[in-house]
């Protein structure tokens, strides 16, 4: 036994000596080239072929990586793979906030087997730690992630032709089946995180739909038809040479349902929402970076664009270089103005209708404002904001929808006299759907009480509005009378000097005549 350990010690000493000699004699570059050569030789004589699918491709996220990750994380695929693989496969389980399902995934540097058309395919989740860099122009993730696909060489055509397309299609199907959309917001100052993501996301679970949306049915129908034609119009946009995008401008008083309409659009189309906060974007370059990182089939929203940044009527707050700085009255929430932050109007226009707006496809831009008269006309023209949707005060059809949503009351369930009162008052009351909803929520347990209070509120608003209109008319009449009196005084003031001049001139003429008579 002692001879065995003596032999092992001698062998280890010999290996250590040889390693030291190799490191001293051969430079690192030569050793690395030799290892690469050995790897290539091994691949030549190997019966398998390998494909690497990295998470990040240059500056962009690899969509194929996301598709593979979603495909492998589906519970059905994982169960099938585990049953056909060895029992040592390690899976990671995650559940993100607001999600209704548990997500499966491969652990770091673990493998899983998939079967496609009778062909066995091996997937490996490769995670490599990056070396710490003392300086870098762009932050890099601490880990380099990717999937390695291993198949037999004779099955190469199968993978390239159909398997990857199958994975992409399956991932889209899984996502539609899960019905989980994402709501994104831009990071402060577009500071890219470790994985080059300028957007932070949460699960989007807004219940608003076009069925529950309180607005005119005809207007709602036109919007749904326009959205449907857009989603199915890939061939049309390609044939006409137009970018596959659409712009909507929602304008109207606060509380009229602009945000609810955006949520209903996302639920109707199954699109993600990117809520762009312009006050967090410092310049046009960062605006382009944000657009580059948005996905297809998404709605890009800028709410209250007239308040977010001073991009209203041209000529106001304009610098010499043509840019529009933040309004000094607008702060970052802490009471401090962002120094040196500016986005030009041309940058925003190019964001919606320039070359950069073609990044990706099937995108919808939605701007909202409470004061459309403040916006620059260049921002509202067709091609940028294709459809202008006025979100006005609550009308009788919208009121009936709210009664159905909150109280489960149909038109035939209500007294015709009460309905007539509502129909007569709601137009003149100028009440928002949000105010009506608040009354119904307070009394949702008692439908009769809710209806009585709605009628009472509508009548009170009508009386107040009539009084307000009457006061305005009286004020206008008073102003008109004052203006007339002032004009009359001005005329008198102008006439009095002329009259004096005439009197003086007449008196002088009489004196001259008397002097002539005396002579």
From Swiss-Prot:
It catalyses: ATP + H2O = ADP + phosphate + H(+). It comes from the Eukaryota. Residues 489-508 have a biased composition (Basic and acidic residues). SUPFAM superfamilies: P-loop containing nucleoside triphosphate hydrolases. SMART domains: AAA. It is an enzyme of class 3 (hydrolase). Its EC number is 3.6.1.-. This is AAA-ATPase At4g30250.
């Amino acid at each position: 036994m002692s001879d065995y350990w003596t032999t092992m010690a001698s062998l280890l000493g010999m290996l250590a000596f040889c390693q030291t000699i190799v490191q001293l004699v051969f430079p690192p570059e030569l050793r690395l080239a030799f290892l690469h050569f050995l790897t290539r030789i091994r691949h030549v004589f190997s019966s398998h072929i390998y494909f690497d699918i990295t998470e990040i491709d240059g500056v962009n996220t690899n969509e194929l990586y996301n598709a593979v990750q979603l495909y492998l994380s589906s519970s059905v695929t994982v169960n099938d793979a585990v049953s056909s693989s060895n029992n040592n496969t390690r899976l990671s389980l995650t559940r993100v906030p607001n999600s209704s399902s548990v997500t499966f995934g491969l652990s770091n540097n673990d493998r899983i087997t998939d079967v496609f058309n009778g062909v066995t395919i091996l997937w490996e989740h490769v995670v490599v730690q990056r070396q710490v860099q003392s300086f870098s122009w762009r932050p890099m993730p601490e880990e380099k992630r990717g999937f390695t696909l291993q198949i037999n060489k004779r099955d190469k055509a199968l993978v390239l032709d159909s398997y990857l397309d199958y994975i992409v299609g399956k991932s889209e199907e899984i996502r539609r089946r899960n019905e989980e959309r994402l709501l994104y917001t831009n990071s402060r100052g577009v500071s890219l995180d470790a994985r080059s993501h300028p957007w932070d996301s949460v699960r989007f679970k807004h219940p608003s739909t076009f069925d529950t949306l309180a607005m005119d049915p005809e207007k709602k129908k036109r919007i749904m038809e326009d959205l449907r034609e857009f989603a199915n119009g890939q061939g049309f946009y390609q044939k006409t040479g137009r970018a596959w995008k659409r712009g909507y401008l929602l304008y109207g008083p606060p509380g009229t349902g602009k945000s609810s309409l955006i949520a209903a659009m996302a639920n109707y189309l199954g699109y993600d929402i990117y809520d762009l906060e312009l006050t967090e974007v410092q310049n046009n370059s960062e605006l382009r970076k944000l657009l580059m990182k948005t996905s297809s089939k998404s709605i890009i929203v800028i709410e209250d664009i007239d308040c977010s940044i001073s991009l209203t009527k041209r000529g106001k707050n304009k610098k010499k270089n043509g840019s529009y700085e933040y309004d000094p009255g607008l702060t970052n929430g802490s009471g401090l103005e962002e120094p040196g932050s500016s986005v030009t109007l041309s940058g925003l226009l190019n964001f919606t209708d320039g070359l950069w707006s073609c990044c990706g496809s099937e995108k919808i831009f939605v701007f909202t404002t409470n004061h459309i008269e403040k916006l620059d006309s260049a921002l509202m023209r067709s091609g940028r904001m294709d459809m202008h949707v006025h979100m006005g005060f609550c009308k009788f059809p919208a009121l009936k929808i709210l009664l159905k949503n909150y109280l489960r009351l149909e038109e035939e369930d209500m007294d015709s006299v009460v309905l007539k009162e509502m129909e007569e008052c709601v137009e003149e009351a100028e009440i928002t759907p949000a105010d009506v909803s608040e009354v119904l929520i307070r009394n949702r347990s008692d439908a009769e009480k809710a209806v009585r209070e709605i009628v009472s509120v509508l009548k009170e608003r009508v009386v107040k509005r009539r009084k307000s209109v009457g006061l305005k008319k009286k004020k206008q009449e008073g102003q008109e009378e004052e203006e007339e009196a002032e004009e009359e005084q001005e005329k008198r003031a102008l006439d009095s000097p002329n009259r004096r001049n005439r009197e003086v001139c007449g008196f002088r003429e009489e004196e001259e005549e008397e002097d002539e008579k005396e002579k």
